[in-house]
A protein has these predicted regions:
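C-terminal nucleotide
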Residues: 1-9, 13, 34-71, 166-314, ...
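Structural signature of FAD isoalloxazine-binding scaffolds in flavoprotein oxidoreductases
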Residues: 22-41, 161
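His/acidic/aromatic-lined binding-pocket segments of jelly-roll/cupin-type domains
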Residues: 25-27, 157, 324
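Glycine-rich phosphate-binding loop
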Residues: 320
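Gly/Ser-rich oxyanion-binding loop with an adjacent helix/lid
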Residues: 1-10, 14-23, 68-182, 307, ...
Length: 358
């Protein structure tokens, strides 16, 4: 019996830039999914997860099944298929898992699960031959093809590596980054407003679809291939172009936030983080589905009232529901947490600790 762990992730900068092969700043955090696993003699994977019904999936047929979109066993089959395509080995295993990540709660439970499954296959059948970067790509492929969600690579890469990482996906650049918030006198927090990303795949998928449509106007497949000056010279009214404008501004902001961390410049980082949050709200518009759950919008409004002039706040991850990320002086966090939990319930607001941050 072997033990495994896959962390959740927090997106620090680069909101909806990864699916356009843009730039991202993300990090693994100190909560995730733990499991014990052992080989089986057959080609079945059986997973028992605390709080969920156990499931068994056969590895004999790894073709894409649209009926399994959104189901965890689809991710198992997808990761297994990618390992085989890469020349690896697969086989059955039994796993007992316990997750500290709420499904749809904003710390990328699906990516953590993909990385966990990849690590189990890697250890039990491949002697650890696959790198974290390869496992991240296997997870992304599983999510795109088998799970039916058009995610970029940010979630999986952050979950697969330890600590903070800067990604320039167009350039193929992956760099470790120090994110010493505590040493900068800051506390990073996440407030779960109670909404869930589950069931919001269509709203999420509309964002990359809009961005791809703008890119094609300029003869490109992704916005990272489009000259920002060319776009702004020919910008058209409408949501798709607003989302493209967000991409170009956010993509330029990511290395600036990386550099602010390197200098431990708290004031500049907070300024840029607030600019990221405003861009998501005003241009990307991934806060609320029309007529849908408004808890994320209310959470951002609360954070604004509490932290204006003191800290920074932004939508976390895919948006439309889920979590508010906030950064503030350490001395301000107790009062902030008390106020947010008064609105969203006990335990809804927690400090996020980045693994390997210092």
């Amino acid at each position: 019996m072997q033990r495994f762990f896959a962390p959740g992730r927090t997106e620090l900068a680069g909101n909806h830039t990864d699916h356009q092969l843009g730039r991202v700043l993300a990090a693994s955090v100190d909560v995730g999914i733990r499991a014990r696993a052992a080989r089986r003699r057959d080609r079945r994977v059986c997973i028992h997860s605390r709080g969920y019904r156990p499931f068994t999936v056969s590895l004999d047929d790894l073709s894409v099944d649209a009926r399994a979109y959104g189901k965890p066993w689809a991710l198992v089959r997808g990761v297994a298929a990618s390992i085989l395509e890469a020349g690896g080995q697969i086989g059955g295993f039994e796993a007992w898992a316990s997750s500290a990540l709420r499904t749809g709660g904003g710390l990328s439970s699906s990516a953590a699960f993909e990385i966990l499954v990849g690590r189990i296959f890697n250890a039990l059948y491949n002697g650890g031959a696959f790198t974290p970067e390869q496992l991240a790509r296997f997870g992304q492929q599983a999510e795109n093809r088998h799970f039916g969600k058009p995610s970029g690579l940010m979630d999986q890469m952050a979950c697969a590596r330890s600590g903070a990482v800067y990604l320039d996906l167009a350039a193929g650049e992956i760099l470790p980054v120090a994110a010493p918030f505590a040493a900068m006198g800051l506390t990073l927090s996440l407030t779960d407003t109670g909404g869930s990303h589950a069931g919001l795949t269509a709203a999420y998928a509309a964002i990359p679809a809009d961005m791809h449509s703008v890119a094609r106007r300029f003869g490109a497949e992704t916005l990272s291939q489009v000259d920002p000056a060319d776009f702004f010279a020919h910008r058209q009214p409408g949501l798709a172009d607003d989302r493209a404008a967000h991409f170009f501004a956010e993509n330029a902001r990511v290395p600036q936030m990386r550099d602010a961390l390197a200098r431990r410049d708290a004031g500049e980082y907070l300024r840029l983080m607030n600019a990221s949050g405003r861009s998501s709200e005003q241009l990307l518009r991934n806060i609320q589905v029309r007529g849908g759950d408004d808890r994320l919008a209310r959470g951002l409004a609360c954070a604004s009232a509490l932290l204006d002039g003191v800290g920074a706040w932004r939508v976390h991850g895919g948006g439309f529901a889920g979590c508010v990320q906030a950064l503030m002086p350490c001395t301000a966090f107790p009062a902030y947490r008390q106020a947010m939990e008064a609105r969203f319930g006990p335990g809804s607001c927690r400090e996020l600790r980045i693994t390997g941050a210092e």
